[in-house]
Regions:
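Sec-dependent bacterial lipoprotein signal peptides
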Residues: 1-14
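Bacterial signal peptide processing site
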Residues: 17-19
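A short beta-strand-turn-helix
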Residues: 27-49
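Hydrophobic beta-strand anchors of alpha/beta hydrolase catalytic cores
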Residues: 50-51, 121
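Conserved redox-active cysteine motifs that mediate thiol-disulfide chemistry
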Residues: 53-70
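Thiol-based oxidoreductase modules, predominantly thioredoxin-like and allied folds used
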Residues: 79-93, 102-108
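Short, internal strand/loop/helix patches
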Residues: 95-127
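Thiol-/selenol-based redox modules, centered on thioredoxin-like
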Residues: 129-154
Length: 154
């Protein structure tokens, strides 16, 4: 009985961490919770952008949602674009979880983003080239400013 529980725990941890190796975000436009299509993931309106990928089934994603929202507010005030992509699930749970991030949350019910783990934080430049990719949530960062510094933002 312990072996199946251990295996389930290992698989759950693997699903909530990890990273991909693509050097650019895809040139796709995902719908937003508010209705219109969002900007291309491969483009960035500012010098750097932060893209956060989360999933409704990920307990870590739920736990750190308030931190992500605070980080996005901080980055907005600093003039840095950010976006949250909610995916890796059916559209109902995606929309419900996306509501916590606001009407500009991007919905990926088609699996356009191929994240191996969530949450995932991707910093890109204006052209969409990946500068930094972090799987999981950084430990020890207790404020939006510390999180921004961890991701080399602003």
């Amino acid at each position: 009985m312990k072996a199946p529980l251990f295996l389930a725990a290992v698989l759950a941890l693997a699903a909530c961490g990890g990273s991909d190796t693509a050097s650019r975000l895809p040139d796709v436009r995902l719908p937003t919770l508010g209705g219109p299509q969002g900007p291309s993931l491969a483009a960035c309106a500012t010098e750097k952008c932060l893209t956060v990928i989360v999933a409704p089934w990920c307990s870590v994603c739920h736990t750190v949602t308030p931190d992500i929202v605070r980080l996005r507010r901080f980055l907005d005030k600093a003039g840095i674009s950010s976006r949250v992509v909610v995916g890796l699930a059916e559209i109902g749970p995606i929309k419900e979880f996306a509501a916590l991030y606001g009407s500009d949350a991007l919905l990926d019910d088609q699996g356009v983003i191929k994240a191996r783990g969530v949450p995932q934080f991707i910093v890109t430049n204006r052209a969409g080239d990946v500068i930094k990719r972090v799987g999981g949530f950084p430990r020890g960062a207790s404020s939006a400013e510390e999180l921004a510094a961890y991701f080399d933002l602003p």
